[in-house]
């Protein structure tokens, strides 16, 4: 028999009754029932109940074991009586009667419990992550993550993609977030950078004649902490294709990701045909370029109903500024003053002056609008709004006014708030869509200049002619995102493979041809030697796994994450380097001045 086990703790069944077996694992729980000890023995695969009665030679050792000790148990498999069968355990029809128990490793008193799902301080959980990972839900999440990544690899291979790995040590790139820099010992004063994404390398692969590339790529960004992103590193399914238009990328990736979601959704419905929503439409309907389509609320413009109306706040805004619009947020079943007042109070808590509203109720046989706005604009305008929005008795509508560029994010948050408060969001489904036709440029308010809205290597719609336009902010890009339940899970574009177009695109944001050659020299040179039309995208693996397992945050699907201060509490990183290490790297730290 093997030194440690003949079976795993999930393997034994009724067919094994009468067998002599050996198990090893962690003591999950010990119970004393009338002098008989019951030990739940756990390993990576599952759990088996071990019985040690007072007549067993193993009983003396069994009395000493405690939770999370690692033990080896030899014994006989016996069937449980009908009244003790545990149908919640795969091994619940049998138990192991211990003949010998060997303690392989004792455990100190635990700094946090691993039994159940306690709400424990995050820093304690991260410092003792090796214990935290023993918890059933977290352990299953990590296993499921591995299964999802394996399925991605398999399905990408099935549709003709090949995995290639790109360098981890590379050059610093000026676009995007801050780089993590790695000092060079051989070249004092020079630094490598950890890649924010394999963007330039995968495009170079297409220029090199490869096609249908993918990899499970680690990406590193030195960003300030955000609730929706882990500090330090994250993983993406990165891919690129040659001789394609954006429809080709969509046609390849939509079935693949739908299959991944269907395989791991646990029976929840998954969108069959992903709608393709232009960016401008998404902003106006949902107040976001990553809308949660499980929320049925769609905003509409109702400016005409307030122009010249008795509600002077809106009427005066419209008259004085042609950019002003009034957006309506219809709220089915929200027609109570209490709910409307709660929404108004929430808006004020967000720094807004309030949230105007109308709600409708029947007075006898007549459907009337109620609230201050209804009184000010009159019955005819109120009914016109109701008709436009398709509202009925018991429904409400909220209004946001101003220049859309300044208020659309708040309007989107109000839409989300209303949908959640009214339980309109179906949480037992996955709604996926494409967001397309992103703006190529945007206005940088801080620096008072035009800047790239997203990926600077995207192909602008209209090509070189569009880049010579007087209205740069009107240019759209062949860029697209995939969104699921309000989360961006992928982003991509058709790339610009023309050196002339590349130079012009960067000139429009204030960078010269010399700047382009200096910062993106490898890609710029490659494009001068025959570059195929190409495009691709990258899926955020962490977010996809989080959605599929129903985790509340990204730490619940990551093995050894950092905390929100970008510290690895388990390994003690970041840490100070020794003077000898710094001398080797020709680095002298400059002490920071204290305020």
Curated annotation (Swiss-Prot):
Main location: cytoplasm
Residues binding L-aspartate, per UniProt: 175, 221, 454, 495
GO BP annotations listed: aspartyl-tRNA aminoacylation
PANTHER family assigned: ASPARTATE--TRNA LIGASE, MITOCHONDRIAL, ASPARTYL/LYSYL-TRNA SYNTHETASE
UniProt keyword ATP-binding present: yes
Site positions for Important for tRNA non-discrimination: 33
Source organism (scientific name): Rhizobium meliloti (strain 1021) (Ensifer meliloti)
Protein name according to UniProt: Aspartate--tRNA(Asp/Asn) ligase
Any coiled-coil regions, as ranges: none
């Amino acid at each position: 028999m093997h030194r440690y086990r003949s079976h795993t703790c999930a393997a034994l069944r009724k067919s094994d009754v009468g067998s002599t077996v050996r198990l090893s694992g962690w003591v999950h729980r010990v119970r004393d029932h009338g002098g008989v000890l019951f030990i739940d023995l756990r390993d990576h695969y599952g759990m088996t109940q071990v019985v040690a009665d007072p007549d067993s030679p193993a009983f003396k050792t069994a009395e000493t074991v405690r939770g999370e000790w690692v033990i080896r148990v030899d014994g006989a498999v016996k069937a449980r009586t009908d009244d003790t069968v545990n149908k919640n355990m795969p091994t619940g029809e049998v138990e192991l009667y211990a003949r010998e128990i060997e303690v392989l490793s004792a455990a100190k008193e635990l700094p946090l419990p691993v039994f159940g799902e306690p709400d424990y301080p995050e820093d304690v959980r991260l410092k003792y992550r090796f214990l935290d990972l023993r918890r059933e839900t977290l352990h299953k999440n990590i296993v499921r993550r591995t299964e999802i990544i394996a399925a991605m690899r398999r399905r990408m291979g099935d549709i003709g993609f090949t995995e290639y790995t790109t360098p981890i040590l590379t050059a610093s790139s000026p676009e995007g977030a801050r780089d993590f820099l790695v000092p060079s010992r051989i070249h004092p004063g020079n630094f490598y950078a950890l890649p924010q994404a394999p963007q330039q390398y995968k495009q170079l692969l297409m220029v090199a004649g490869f096609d249908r590339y993918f990899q499970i790529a680690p990406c590193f960004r030195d960003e300030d902490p955000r609730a929706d992103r882990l500090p330090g590193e994250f993983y993406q399914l990165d891919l690129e294709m040659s001789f394609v238009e954006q429809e080709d990328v969509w046609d390849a990736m939509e079935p693949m990701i739908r299959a991944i979601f269907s395989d791991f959704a646990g029976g929840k419905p998954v969108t069959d045909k992903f709608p393709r929503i232009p960016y401008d439409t998404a902003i106006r309907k949902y107040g976001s370029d990553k809308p949660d389509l499980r929320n049925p609320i769609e905003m509409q413009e109702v400016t005409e109903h307030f122009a010249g109306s008795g509600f002077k706040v809106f009427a005066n805004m419209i008259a004085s500024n042609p950019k002003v619009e009034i957006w309506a947020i219809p709220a089915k079943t929200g027609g109570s003053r209490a709910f409307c007042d709660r929404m108004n109070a929430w808006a004020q808590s967000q720094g807004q002056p309030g949230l105007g509203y109308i709600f409708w109720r029947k007075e006898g046989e007549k459907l009337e609008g109620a609230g201050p706005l209804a009184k000010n604009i009159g019955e005819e305008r109120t009914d016109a709004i109701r008709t436009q929005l398709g509202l009925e008795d018991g429904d409400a509508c909220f209004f946001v006014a101003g220049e859309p560029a300044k208020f659309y994010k708040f309007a989107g948050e109000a839409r989300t708030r209303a949908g959640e408060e009214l339980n309109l969001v179906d949480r037992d489904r996955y709604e996926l869509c494409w967001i397309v036709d992103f703006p190529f440029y945007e206005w940088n308010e801080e620096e008072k200049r035009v800047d790239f809205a997203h990926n600077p290597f995207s192909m602008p719609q209209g090509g070189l002619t569009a880049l010579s336009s007087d209205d740069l902010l009107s240019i759209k890009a062949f860029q697209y995102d995939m969104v699921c339940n309000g989360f961006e899970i992928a982003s991509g574009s058709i790339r610009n493979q023309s050196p002339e177009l590349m130079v012009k695109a960067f000139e429009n944001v204030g960078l010269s041809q010399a700047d382009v050659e200096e910062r993106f020299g490898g890609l710029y040179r490659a494009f001068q030697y025959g570059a195929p039309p190409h495009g691709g995208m990258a899926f955020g693996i962490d977010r996809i796994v989080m959605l599929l397992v129903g985790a509340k945050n990204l730490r619940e699907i990551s093995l050894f994450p950092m905390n929100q201060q970008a510290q690895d509490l388990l390994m003690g990183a970041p840490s100070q380097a020794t003077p000898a290490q710094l001398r080797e790297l020709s680095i002298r730290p400059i002490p920071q001045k204290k305020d």
